[in-house]
């Protein structure tokens, strides 16, 4: 039986074909010439010390629907940065998450920290789109990609000077992710097949990831106690969105998570 991830990937392949017709690759490459310089996403989220926050600009999700009605991506991103986020993640999927590349462009202009394009990346064309929109990093999801595509997309991202955040859920995918040389590895605590979350998943996986690779824990992080557990396990960064954007006072939510006075 097809999962929500299967459905999203099938939809995305159609969207990519349509995008290539609407905006040929030559036009995307031309737009890259005027894109802002790349900021060092890897350095921002892997600095020694506290667990670094990658705060996500997220309007909706397939499981929860609309998360925030008064959604202003640039203002949310500025709030995140002002309260201590080390980087910003922007969802660009339109159908399932109500995101857009325009949101990414707006966020990139609004903040001084590095910005990640969070998307179901299946084609090098999307990597070019990301850079043209000002992205400093791009997410790759191992569960969506075979070995060849994973390696090709990783190299495409690196060739443009951006950071690849390579995400996995299934531990069986870890050898594949390590084989391409990924330095920044995301552990999704949400099973993309069932959409259930389990923070323990990151803690278990930290023991399997080599110490010279930086680890990002993604999904299901809600409290300062959760952050303390990640820190104790040696996790470098966390990607948090839903538990922040649903709060009336986003800045206060970030302060609580980071333990700001």
At which residue positions do the language-model features occur?
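An N-cap/entry alpha-helix motif that binds or orients negatively charged groups
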Residues: 2-70
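Catalytic cores of alpha/beta
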Residues: 122-133, 169-180, 217, 221-240, ...
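Receiver (REC) domain switch/active-site residues of two-component response regulators
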Residues: 6, 86, 136, 183, ...
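Active-site beta-loop-alpha junctions enriched in small/polar residues
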Residues: 11, 58-60, 93, 120-121, ...
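C-terminal helical cap(s) of enzyme catalytic domains, especially alpha/beta-barrels
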Residues: 204-208, 231, 246-261
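Catalytic-face loop-and-helix region of soluble metabolic enzyme cores
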Residues: 184-240
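N-terminal active-site wall of soluble small-molecule enzyme domains
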Residues: 52, 57, 64-165, 171-176, ...
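Glycine-rich phosphate-binding active-site loops on the catalytic face of alpha/beta enzymes
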Residues: 129-149, 186-195, 235-254
């Amino acid at each position: 039986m097809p999962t929500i991830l299967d459905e999203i990937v099938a939809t995305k392949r159609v969207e990519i074909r349509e995008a290539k017709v609407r905006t040929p690759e030559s036009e995307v490459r031309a737009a890259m010439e005027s894109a802002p310089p790349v900021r060092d996403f890897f350095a921002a989220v892997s600095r020694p010390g506290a667990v670094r926050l990658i705060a996500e600009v997220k309007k909706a999700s397939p499981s929860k629907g609309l998360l925030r009605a008064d959604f202003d991506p640039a203002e949310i991103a500025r709030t995140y940065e002002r309260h201590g986020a080390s980087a910003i993640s922007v969802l660009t999927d339109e159908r399932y998450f109500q995101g857009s590349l325009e949101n990414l462009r707006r966020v990139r202009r609004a903040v001084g920290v590095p910005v990640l394009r969070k998307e179901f990346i299946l084609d090098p064309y999307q990597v070019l789109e990301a850079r043209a929109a000002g992205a400093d990093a791009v997410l790759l999801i191992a569960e969506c990609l075979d070995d060849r595509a994973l390696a090709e997309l990783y190299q495409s991202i690196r060739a443009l000077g951006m950071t690849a955040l390579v995400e996995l859920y299934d531990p069986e995918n870890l050898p594949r992710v390590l084989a391409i040389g990924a330095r920044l590895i995301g552990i999704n605590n949400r099973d993309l097949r069932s959409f259930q979350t389990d923070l323990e998943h990151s803690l278990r996986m930290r023991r399997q990831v080599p110490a010279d690779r930086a680890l990002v824990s993604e999904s299901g992080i809600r409290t300062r106690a959760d952050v303390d557990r990640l820190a104790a396990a040696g996790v470098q960064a966390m990607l948090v969105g839903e538990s922040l954007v649903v709060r009336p006072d986003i800045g206060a939510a970030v302060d609580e998570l980071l333990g700001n006075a």
